[in-house]
């Protein structure tokens, strides 16, 4: 079962949400709307290789059109003049493409540069005054600025392997907020269900040995990295801890959305979730399950 949800922001965001931001919102929603036992049961399914669902990275949704991460592929381009070189640099900096461009990349091996599609993201600065918690005044405090993001609509694609989780995941996403500074009203949105990108399901069901990932993904032994094209991101983020104290996770790295991997065995998903922090009896997990779309041009 393939579902798509669109987030329509009602407030600024601390940062652009990631795959793990969405997964964290779902997990906290399960704990608050169901129970801690249901959350632990769900996490156990992910830990033992039986994920009830997988999610894409947040994808910009512009005027009813899906925007995807630029597919990473080696394209031999030899600039012949200054204009060609400028176009090549522009292509190298591109981060997003339309679903139509991404789909063409899945249908046949790309031989030329892609046309970039830019989502609308506006930065703003909010002034704050440090508060003296003993006197409950700003006396002695310092003025500082906080950078925030005003995002246009974005969405996620969810592939359900267990259909009973569909109403629960939707309820959790309707209930939650995303990202940091929730107590100051950031990360609010209205959730709407919509149609997945046209024709996407066939690139999930018709598998091959070459896949493009549309979510952050931990390394999988099934990857042949010598014959793959990918970017790696290293992070040490704060814990999505549901309005409680700030805790930092251990450092980890994963393949970014848009990465192209040669796989030994075609599967529904790759990677997994990892324990990135343990404090006493509390374990913190990071979502790193790769959502693959399979290319037709390699069997």
Describe the residue ranges of each PLM region.
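Conserved active-site/ligand-binding neighborhood in enzyme cores
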Residues: 1-299
């Amino acid at each position: 079962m393939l579902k798509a949800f669109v987030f329509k922001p009602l407030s600024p965001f601390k940062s652009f949400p990631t795959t793990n931001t969405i997964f964290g919102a779902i997990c906290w929603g399960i704990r608050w709307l169901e129970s801690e036992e249901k959350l632990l049961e769900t996490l156990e399914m992910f830990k033992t290789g039986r994920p009830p669902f997988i999610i894409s990275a947040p994808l910009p949704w512009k005027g009813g059109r899906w925007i995807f991460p630029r597919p990473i592929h080696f394209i031999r381009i030899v600039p012949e003049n200054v204009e060609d070189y400028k176009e090549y640099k522009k292509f190298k900096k591109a981060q997003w493409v339309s679903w139509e461009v991404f789909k063409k990349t899945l249908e046949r091996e790309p031989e030329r540069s892609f046309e970039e599609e830019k989502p609308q993201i506006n930065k703003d600065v909010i002034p704050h005054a440090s508060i003296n918690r003993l006197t409950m005044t700003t006396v002695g405090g310092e003025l500082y600025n906080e950078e925030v993001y005003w995002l246009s609509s974005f969405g996620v694609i969810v592939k359900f392997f267990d259909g009973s989780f569909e109403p629960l995941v939707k309820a959790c996403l309707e209930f939650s907020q995303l990202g940091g500074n929730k107590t100051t009203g950031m990360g609010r949105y209205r959730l709407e269900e919509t149609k997945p990108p046209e024709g996407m399901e066939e690139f999930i069901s018709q598998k091959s040995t070459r896949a493009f990932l549309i979510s952050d993904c931990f390394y999988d032994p099934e990857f042949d990295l010598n014959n793959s094209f990918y970017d790696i991101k290293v992070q040490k983020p704060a814990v999505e801890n549901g309005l409680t104290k700030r805790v930092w996770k251990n450092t980890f790295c994963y393949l970014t959305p848009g990465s192209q991997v040669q796989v030994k065995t075609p599967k529904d998903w790759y990677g997994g979730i990892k324990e990135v922090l343990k404090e006493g009896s509390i374990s913190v997990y990071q979502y790193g399950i790769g959502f693959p779309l399979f290319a037709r041009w390699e069997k």
